[in-house]
A protein has these predicted regions:
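Positively charged n-region of N-terminal signal peptides that target proteins for export
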Residues: 1-5
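Hydrophobic membrane-insertion alpha-helices, especially the h-region
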Residues: 6-23
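A transmembrane-helix-recognition feature enriched in membrane-embedded lipid enzymes
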Residues: 168-188
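A structural signal for short, hydrophobic/glycine-enriched beta-strand patches
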Residues: 22-172
């Protein structure tokens, strides 16, 4: 009888914890529209590499004057800045090229979300920056925010999720499990 009660309690605790984590995951994956409307002058736009939609969205925010600087974290070490520019600006617009050349910075050290946070925080401290628009995919955003929040309390993050294929349940589940692992890890440590 006690074993049955213990198992029931454990299962209910897991369900409750999963519900809390799913709720937090859902909240963190949303765009902070209120913060974006109240502030159009951020210290930096930070893009975590992945699909090129993220980098293009970050550059659109730079063009819209949300910030004067954009940092792309986790760029493959063999990719040159001018190669990245050609992908983002395929039509060779002189104005866009000038903006890219002056205001886009790339980091090549990060290999995962945790090292993205470390790389970005290091760059922001070096440049005395505090507020940032964080651009990444909607399902990657919650874990990214956790990594940033748990590696510094000196920056103010406003999120800009880039929509992914929400029909892919496997990708959602993988990212939710990664998020849950990171959340529990930081709660324990």
């Amino acid at each position: 009888m006690q074993l049955k009660t213990l198992l029931t309690t454990i299962i209910l605790a897991i369900i409750f914890l999963s519900f809390l984590l799913l709720n937090e995951f859902n909240l963190l994956s949303k765009k902070n529209d209120r913060e974006l409307k109240n502030n159009t002058n951020f210290d930096s736009i930070v893009v975590l590499t992945g699909k090129f939609d993220r980098i293009k969205k970050g550059f659109e925010l730079l063009e819209a004057n949300y910030s004067k600087k954009m940092f792309i974290s986790g760029v493959n070490p063999i990719v040159k800045k001018n190669e990245l520019r050609k992908i983002i600006i395929p039509n060779n617009s002189t104005e866009k090229i000038s903006l890219f050349d002056c205001c886009v910075f790339i980091g090549k050290e990060a290999k995962n979300t945790k090292t993205n946070a470390v790389e970005v925080i290091k760059w922001m401290k070096k440049n005395n920056l505090i507020s940032v628009i964080l651009v990444t995919s909607d399902i990657h955003l919650p874990r990214s925010i956790l990594e940033f929040q748990n590696n510094t309390n000196h920056i103010k993050i406003t999120s800009w999720p880039v929509k992914t294929n929400s029909n892919n349940f496997i990708n959602f589940l993988k990212e939710f499990l990664r998020f849950s692992f990171v959340r529990i890890k930081y709660l324990i440590l």
